[in-house]
Amino acid sequence: MSNWLMLEGDVCAVTGALGGMGTEICREFARNGANVVMLDLDEEKVKAAAAALSEEFGIHAEGYKMNACNEDEVQAAVDATIRDFGRVDVLVNTAGILRFSPMEDLPLSDWNDVINVNLTGTFVASQRFGREMIKAGKGRLVHISTAASYSPETFSGVYSSTKAGVNMLSKMLAAEWGPYGVRSNCVCPCFVKTPMSASFYADPEVEKSRSRLIATRRIGEVTDIANAVMFLASTRSDFTTGAEIMVDGGFSNMMGDLTAKPGGRRAFAENYLKNKGVDLWTDVAGVKTPSDQ
């Protein structure tokens, strides 16, 4: 167990705790001696996951059912946290969903679903847990955003839009709650292996091709994201608030949206346009990428 982060004994709540990224963040908190509040939709599974975490790391972990879009469930989770732990020091918002569609075909129901989970859910959880932090005069909020909140990702417009909203929400919380001792920051991943992106990397050639587009020449792991979250969740980052930290292997500094990204959204875009008789690179971009030559 490392003491450098000084997280030992802190109470750290994580939404979307049963997802690949959320689970690893919970485990990393536990490795550093923090007590963990796991929040997710499946009550039975989240309670079992918390019990396993407690047994493995010897910390206090609890799992509570929580839909971040439901104010009553969020408040119940806050009340349970205060009842069982006495306080909350950290909230990490990882809960999120993704829908692929060209904007002209995106159903309003999909738009509303993604907005509700990714943006409204982040707001409600931050507001309710944040009130307890304001009372205590200290607290740290960390929100999982994406590099696509800066650069458009074709056919993931609603996802990118919500995450851009999360970035601004984080800045507003940082500005308004800073005087109360509460900090708010975002982590912006890209090209990371998670259950949500598993289908992208099922083909080894896709992973190999995508790796060539990244400065570090490898696809990210959930541990890469968890490590960045640990820093922002700790008092080691006490002078950092309202920030967005890119954790993307340098991709966002190297490439724009017209870079070919084999598999996943790019393949979806290429196939969609191909069916309409349009070649993405010659007819739309007017270029051929190195991988096409």
What are the roles of these predicted feature ranges?
Residues S126, T162, S170:
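Active-site helix of classical SDR
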Residues R131, A175-P179, D238:
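Alpha-helical segment proximal to the catalytic Tyr-Lys
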Residues C186, K208-T240, I245-G249, K276-Q293:
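C-terminal helical subdomain
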Residues L98, L106, P152-S160, M172, ...:
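Active-site loop-to-helix junction immediately N-terminal to the catalytic Tyr of the SDR YXXXK motif
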Residues W4-V37:
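Canonical Rossmann dinucleotide-binding motif of NAD(H)/NADP(H)-dependent dehydrogenases/reductases
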Residues P102-M103, D110-I115, R210:
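Substrate-binding pocket helix/loop in short-chain dehydrogenase/reductase
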Residues T146:
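Residue(s) in the substrate-gating loop at a strand-loop-helix junction
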